[in-house]
Amino acid sequence: MERITSLVFFASFLIIFVSGVNQTRADSCDESLGLCETCDERCQAKHGPSCISKCDGEVGMLSCTCTYECGPPLPPKGNVCSGGTGMCSGKCPYKCCDTSCAQKYNGGRGFCNSFGNYNFCQCEYPC
């Protein structure tokens, strides 16, 4: 009798665990990152190495779309503001931009964004 009770308890625990894991799976999200120049690098800088970048649209006006794993929506924590720290340099384009934003804005994250021939360092931070 004790063995059956233990088996029922284990089976119930397993069912609860599997259904909980299934609910926490992340969805796929898309974000447009502007023109296609350095699309893959910008996508990975913003959403990590597991994201997928693609360029599509009309010839001459290809736009960068980044697909990444996103979880359920987070509860509102306040506003997210944007700022900048100038231009991204060729010496250290992405890491330096992120570092500059972290130093300039409390909780800031940075990424390089191309617009025409210019490569701007854009920051997002809680405000």
From Swiss-Prot:
Chief place of localization: secreted
A Gene Ontology BP annotation from the UniProt entry: killing of cells of another organism
Organism in which the protein naturally occurs: Arabidopsis thaliana
Presence of the UniProt keyword Hydrolase in the record: no
Higher taxonomy: Eukaryota, Viridiplantae, Streptophyta, Embryophyta, Tracheophyta
Family note: Belongs to the DEFL family.
Cellular location(s): Secreted
Protein name: Putative defensin-like protein 180
One GO cellular component, as annotated: extracellular region
